[in-house]
Regions:
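Charged, cofactor-coupling segments
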Residues: 1-100
Length: 100
């Protein structure tokens, strides 16, 4: 099953932001049965860099910065071999790690 993950924030009459990815629900390779059953995980399908130019890292937790950096590392790892020239340069620039 494919799910849309769409966290967003909208200020009425002002502005809004939404970051959206499509993800496939996948079974864990070696599931550990718990009192709640076994779990699934999300495999990201839409591997698109998140535009970080308006992110203020002073307002972000270390965990949030780490999540963006891990996501961008995965986007680059999977897409860089498929790109060349200007597209590759753009991908590398847009997946640079965030720093404080």
């Amino acid at each position: 099953m494919v799910t849309s993950i769409e966290p967003g924030l909208y200020r009425p009459g002002k502005w809004g932001i939404r970051i959206e990815n499509l993800a496939a629900n996948q079974a864990v390779a070696n599931p550990q049965e718990t009192e709640f059953g076994s779990f699934l995980y999300f495999e990201t399908l839409t591997l698109c860099p998140i535009d970080t130019r308006l992110m203020d890292t002073a307002l972000m937790t270390d965990g949030e910065i780490d999540w963006v950096n891990r996501y961008h590392a995965e986007v680059r790892r999977r897409l860089e071999p498929l790109t060349e020239g200007a597209a590759k340069a753009w991908l590398i620039k847009r997946t640079e790690p965030l720093a404080r």
